[in-house]
Amino acid sequence: MECDAVIYNITENVQQVEEALWAVSALNEEISHFEKRKVFILLSTVMTWARSKPLDPDDNEVPFTEEDYRRRKHHPNFLDHINAEKIVLKFGKNAKKFATYVVASGLQYGAEGGILHTFFKMAWLGEVPALPVFGDGTNCIPAIHVVDLAGVIQNIIDHVPKLHYLVAVDEAVHTLEDLVKCISKNTGPGKIQKVPKENAFLTKDLTQEYLDHLLVNLRMEALFVKENFNIRWVAQTGFVENINSILKEYKQSRGLLPIKICILGPPAVGKSSISEELAKYYKLHHIKMKDVIAEAIAKLEAIVAPKDSVEGEEEGEEEEEEENVDDAQELLDGIKESMEQNAGRLEDQYIIRFVKEKLKSMPCRNQGFILDGFPKTYDQAKDLFNQEEEEEEEEIRGKIFPYDKLITPEFVCGLDASDEFLKERVMNLPESVVAGTHYSQDRFLRSLSHYRDINTDDETVFNYFDELEIHPIHIDVGKLEDAQNRLAIKQLIKEIGKPRNYGLTDEEKAEEEKKAAEERLAKEAAQTAELEHKEAMEMAEKIARWEEWNKRLEEVKREERELLEVQSVPLRNYLMTYVMPTLMQGLNECCKVRPEDPVDFLAEYLFKNNPEMQ
């Protein structure tokens, strides 16, 4: 209630309608307590005009303006929106105390992309050969940049105009086909494909509300805004005319800036393996010279291959195609001649041309790239990255010369290792890997020697990047003692930073979760097996100790028995010599006499017949 201006946006979330109506009602009830005028602005949508009848039945191109708002007919799915508009306008009758406004906004673009984000994302990812246009694509869509829309709202607050219903659209008249084609051309595959409207429901990011906005056919003109407001327009001429700045906003807002990396170093140092891992981590395009050349030649051959003429082709298109065929054939002939004269190797001028074309391709411009092992020399780097329109051939060293920022790497990594380390690494490679590659002994040593030779002068490829103040990250792979290059990759990721893309797709997330679950189950199974093994080992050890204890106990008992036997020998001898003869005689005599008290008789007998007393 303390705010002088209250703005409710019901274009993005229909749930805001109820809250907006509550707010305007509550403010209206407090009019008598207002010390100064308050302004309430309802940001609505041109979809409340979607079913309006043409102003001129004979001319459908006559646009609607603010003055026609009483004739507007809403789209069936936007009943809540038009009801909200009517209620807000009804509460603004006491404009000196409480002024209410409704702004019918066109399809909003800019910043993160808005409703058009689905097409931006498809184009940026490059996963489809053509962007879809739902229906025939001829429907006109009123639109406005979000910053310009903010300017309209700011002017309403500043000027409090007498007109309470305003239209906010730019001056362009664009169809759905115009918008999609523009996105495809400037950040996508460059092609569009018209598909049935029903196919839109197969695109998960498109809601019914978004689809309604994309399929509306309406011509509108913000006449009052144009004549009465002072707005610093960002995109007054519309989406297509301002696509470059809109794309820049979109990429910056969503953090979709390309990562451009160059990995250099001697043969067998691990350039390709590290590049491959970084390409997977950052979702970049791995640029290998062999693949680039093969792809470029294949494209040229496809152009010059005979094609069946397509009916309906315009004369201008046919002439342009013929010129392309002639140019492609001329280039192919030059490549063939170059390879014949250079023992199967291609001259730098062709390699640089193909690499430059690849780096300027839309996928590389969107996501970025990793240049694997190229350029090798200062001159190659200069020819590849310098601006083509150089003023002078000779550049002053130490001065930053013009270079193509679109394709010049942002990060340069120089891998290195001692010759002994590299030779040993190649020697340890399996024969199946070495066969037919540049890792064979003669070719490898020649390549290594050539690399050392071209990197001893002051004009090395690393000097080129230093002059551009793109200072290479130098890593001595030999000192890391890591055959898998994990430490080098970890160091590079730390230097480069986080990925700049949309992150994992739903499929990749599911795969990651599945992989994590499998790893967790495997870990749990390993822990269970380890625990069971440990318990079994402890039990076996316990049984072994028990058996050992019993064995020792039996041994002790045996030793005790033997000791007792040894100790009892003198006693037995004594008994047999001195006691038993007399005792036996006494027992025999007792048996003969059979006295009443045998014990007393025996004692008396032994006493009388004791040999020591006789």
Swiss-Prot record:
What is an example of a Pfam family matching this protein?
A: Dpy-30
User: Could you say which residues bind AMP here?
Assistant: 323-346, 373-376, 380, 446
Recorded GO cellular component terms are: cytosol; extracellular region; motile cilium
Q: Which SUPFAM superfamilies match?
A: NAD(P)-binding Rossmann-fold domains, P-loop containing nucleoside triphosphate hydrolases
Function according to Swiss-Prot or TrEMBL: Nucleoside monophosphate (NMP) kinase that catalyzes the reversible transfer of the terminal phosphate group between nucleoside triphosphates and monophosphates. Has highest activity toward AMP, and weaker activity toward dAMP, CMP and dCMP. Also displays broad nucleoside diphosphate kinase activity. Involved in maintaining ciliary structure and function.
**Domain of life, per the record?**
Eukaryota
The molecular function GO annotations come to: (d)CMP kinase activity; adenylate kinase activity; ATP binding; nucleoside diphosphate kinase activity
Q: Give the species this sequence originates from.
A: Mus musculus
| Record protein name field | Adenylate kinase 7
- Which InterPro entries does UniProt cross-reference here? Adenylat/UMP-CMP_kin, DD_AK7, Dpy-30_motif, NAD(P)-bd_dom_sf, P-loop_NTPase
- Bias regions of kind Acidic residues — which residues? 311-327
Q: Which GO terms describe its biological process?
A: axoneme assembly; brain development; epithelial cilium movement involved in extracellular fluid movement; establishment of localization in cell; inflammatory response to antigenic stimulus; spermatogenesis
Q: Where is this region: Adenylate kinase?
A: 258-503
